[in-house]
A protein has these predicted regions:
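Extracytoplasmic cell-surface/polysaccharide-interacting catalytic and binding patches
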Residues: 2, 7-12, 16-110, 124-219, ...
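Segments that shape or occlude catalytic/ligand-binding pockets
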Residues: 115
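Short, well-ordered surface patches within globular domains
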Residues: 118-119
Length: 241
């Protein structure tokens, strides 16, 4: 849930066991046929933002902050919020999605561009910088649309997926924790109380994202930063929908 990723000393201790992406024999998914995506707002276009579906047409969009299914238990985005990214992330996300598609997997997007006002609201709800990044006078990470929160899923086959793991005809992979988990198990390279299967799935996600030049934030296995995400920029005035 970070925007400017907060310092978390415990995250560093979890980096010892860094596993390589495991081989997979899953049947590749067909390349999706692009569908017409409504243009982003004039403000978003001027800021260099694009709808992620224009570069990852099979993206599964599950923006948690557009619902109450998030750590604040409050709906922070309008229901029609879109996953918008800065165009500097587009090529990298396409590369990652292409690699995962060959393994029968798709990317599920939990958060993308996050308005500054929402970051302020988050910190007001949970004023703990170990959990939520303290807002500043500059836009970084999610606030600059250069970070995404993601997981992996594959197409559901029959009744093989637990109901809690289903999302839009897909089944999410076991990653060891859910989104916005505030325990040490959420650290990207955690091994304690994280199954071998979940560690392998995290490694698979990291490897694919790394091929696109997108790197994990070690404090949260789901948070990935694009080029220049940590550079402070003017705060955007862009609607999330």
């Amino acid at each position: 849930m970070t925007s400017t990723s907060p310092t978390n000393p415990a995250a560093a201790s979890s980096t010892a066991a860094r596993t390589s992406a495991p081989p997979t024999t899953a049947k590749p998914s067909p390349t999706p046929t692009p569908t017409a995506i409504p243009p982003v707002s004039a403000q978003a276009k001027a800021a260099g933002l694009v709808d992620v579906r224009t570069v990852v047409p099979d993206a599964v969009i599950d923006l948690r902050y557009a619902t109450t299914n998030n750590f604040t238990k409050t709906q922070l985005y309008p229901a029609n919020a879109r996953c918008q990214i800065h165009n500097s992330m587009a090529a990298g996300l396409k590369t990652a999605a292409d690699a995962l598609r060959r393994q029968g997997l798709v990317i599920v997007f939990w958060d993308c561009y996050r308005p500054h006002a929402v970051q302020v609201q988050m910190f007001q709800i949970v004023p703990n910088p170990d959990w939520v990044a303290r807002p500043t006078n500059y836009a970084r990470s999610h606030e600059s649309a250069r970070s995404v929160d993601v997981t992996l899923a594959r197409a559901v086959t029959g009744g093989s997926c637990p109901v809690a793991m289903r999302i839009q005809n897909h089944c999410q992979l076991d990653m060891g924790t859910g989104f916005d988990d505030f325990t040490p198990r959420a650290f990207a390279f955690a091994t304690n109380d994280v199954s071998t299967a979940a560690q392998s799935n995290r490694a698979l996600l990291r490897h694919a994202m790394n091929t696109g030049g997108i790197t994990v934030y070690e404090g949260e296995w789901w948070h990935f930063d694009g080029p220049g995400s940590d550079y402070g920029r003017p705060i955007l005035d862009v609607p999330v929908n």
